[in-house]
Every structure is written in structure tokens, then in C-alpha cells.
């Protein structure tokens, strides 16, 4: 792969890239060859992207060579904690307080064109997206059957903090957080122990 460049794009540029991002989404997911399924999958992604772009603080980083090879995007979690709606049990205090103060940034999607170096590109994308925000935590939700993504996030020091039940899409997601900064990491020593007991693998 040629040298990969990372670049931040604003919401208007992200909207203009919608078609390319949808192609990237379909290419980066193992989908049946049936055209109807691919079209529905593409449309579902575009609808989610449109919804995310409208959220306050939306941010996106793209990876390019001579063409688009990856992207990561998300938004700050609102202080009302709505993003955690459906969390199974009590939200850990170490997460609840930063959420209330606006210190959590949610990564809603990381897409990378399949390639032997795709894990490194994905890691760089998430690091760049989070480094641009003064957040205490990164947060994301993952389908529990998406074992490659769960394994990759865990190798990047994301912690599994529980389950979130949502009415749409997969019934249940694994909720993961990434402590950012030494003080945050130290504050989460107990959470790390909890993560090791909750992790399904």
C-alpha cells in the first residue's frame, strides 16, 4: 500500500463523500453477493451517516493514498447520557461523571479497505480522531458477533464495560471505552478488572 495520509474533513465534505464512504462500507464488510442485500446495506449506512453528521460536534478523519482507503467518525456524547440509553445495569461511576461533563467522545464507525495493513490504518484513524478532542474517554458500541473488531479494539487497550440494548439493529451491543490520559487510566483500575471479568472471549 502507498503511504497513507490522514486528513480531517468537516461535515460538508463528509456529506459530499457519502457515495465513496458507502462504497467503502460495503467493501469493508463481508456481505453476500446478492445485489439487493448490498443495496440495502449501503442505504442503511448512508442513513446512519446522515444522522451522525447532524449531531453537534460531528468529526471525521479519512485515510487516503491516491484514493479513499479508510475513515473514522463520531461525535461528543451529550451530557444527558442519552448515548448510554439501554445500558444493562448501572453505568460505572468512572464513566458516568465524564459523560455528564461532556468528556466522552463516541466513535460510531471505523471503516478500512481490506488490506494486510488495515489494522494499523484503523488504529491510526481512531487515535487521530480522539486526539483532536479534549475527551477523557473514547466510547463505542460493537456487535457481539463481530469478533475481529472486538479483538482489535481490545488489543488497542479498549475496555469492555458492559452491554447496551437498543431497539434497532442488533438487539445487543458490547460497550467499550478507551481511557485517554494518565489520570483517566489510573481512575479506571477497577474498571479494567471489571472488563476482564465481563469480556466474553
Where are the regions that the model predicts?
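Conserved active-site tyrosine of GNAT-family acetyltransferases
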Residues: 25, 152-154, 158
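Conserved acetyl-CoA-binding loop-helix of GNAT-fold acetyltransferases
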Residues: 107-131, 155
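Conserved GNAT acetyl-CoA-binding A-motif
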Residues: 131-144
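Conserved acyl-donor/pantetheine-binding loop and adjacent beta-alpha core of acyl/acetyltransferases
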Residues: 73-111, 117
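A short helix-loop-beta-strand connector motif used in the catalytic cores of GNAT acetyltransferases and
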Residues: 48-62, 77-84, 106
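Conserved catalytic-core motifs of GNAT/GCN5-like acyltransferases
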Residues: 141, 157-174
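Short hydrophobic/aromatic beta-strand element in the GNAT-like acyltransferase core
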Residues: 57-62, 71, 104, 109, ...
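Short amphipathic alpha-helix that is part of the acyltransferase structural core
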Residues: 1-47, 55, 60-69, 73, ...
Amino acid at each position: 500500500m502507498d503511504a497513507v495520509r490522514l486528513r480531517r474533513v468537516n461535515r460538508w465534505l463528509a456529506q459530499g463523500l457519502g457515495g465513496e464512504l458507502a462504497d467503502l462500507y460495503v467493501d469493508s464488510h463481508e456481505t453476500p453477493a446478492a445485489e439487493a442485500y448490498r443495496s440495502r446495506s449501503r442505504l442503511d449506512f448512508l442513513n446512519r451517516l446522515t444522522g451522525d453528521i447532524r449531531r453537534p460536534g460531528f468529526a471525521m478523519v479519512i485515510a487516503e493514498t491516491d484514493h479513499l482507503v479508510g475513515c473514522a467518525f463520531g461525535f461528543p456524547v451529550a451530557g444527558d447520557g442519552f448515548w448510554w440509553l439501554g445500558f444493562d445495569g448501572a453505568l460505572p461511576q468512572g464513566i458516568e461523571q465524564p459523560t455528564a461533563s461532556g468528556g466522552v467522545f463516541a466513535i460510531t464507525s471505523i471503516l478500512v479497505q481490506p488490506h494486510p495493513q488495515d489494522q494499523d490504518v484503523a488504529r491510526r484513524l481512531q487515535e487521530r480522531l480522539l486526539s483532536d478532542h479534549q475527551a477523557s474517554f473514547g466510547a463505542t458500541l460493537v456487535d457481539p458477533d463481530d469478533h475481529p473488531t472486538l479483538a482489535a479494539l481490545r488489543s488497542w487497550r479498549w475496555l469492555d464495560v458492559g452491554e447496551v440494548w437498543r431497539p434497532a439493529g442488533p438487539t445487543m451491543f458490547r460497550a467499550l471505552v478507551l481511557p485517554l490520559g494518565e489520570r483517566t487510566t489510573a481512575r479506571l483500575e477497577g474498571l479494567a478488572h471489571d472488563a476482564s471479568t465481563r469480556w466474553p472471549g
